[in-house]
């Protein structure tokens, strides 16, 4: 029995489409698996000082409204330096302190700034400051602030935790 040529052409065209479709589906599945989502970074720059407010909630601990309100609470600090709230759910470093020092260096270099970090991977909160702000927010005072607000983080109230920390930094 012989198969007509038109049938062969239809089958080979159909097979090619199926193979192409499967390859595209596999490509997009692989691509989708390699993409990591990062929370939207909210920033504000003080026009008179050039210092910034940065809110990076990578662990998605805050609502959009809480991020906005937190940024407003942080804004007065830009008189003395930049200020950041950072939350993470994965810490590739040995400790929370190592992570925050690296983040500070990458984000602010050696300029005056303070960072409040919520490290969900290590279950830790940390404040790191440098420059002019360090004259007020010393390591000792940063430890006092984190001691004061730790109870809010323990209760899962990360907004109040961060808001109160920045209120004490102000």
Task: Tell me what each language-model feature is.
Residues 2-170:
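A structural boundary signal for the start of the first folded domain, especially the loop/turn
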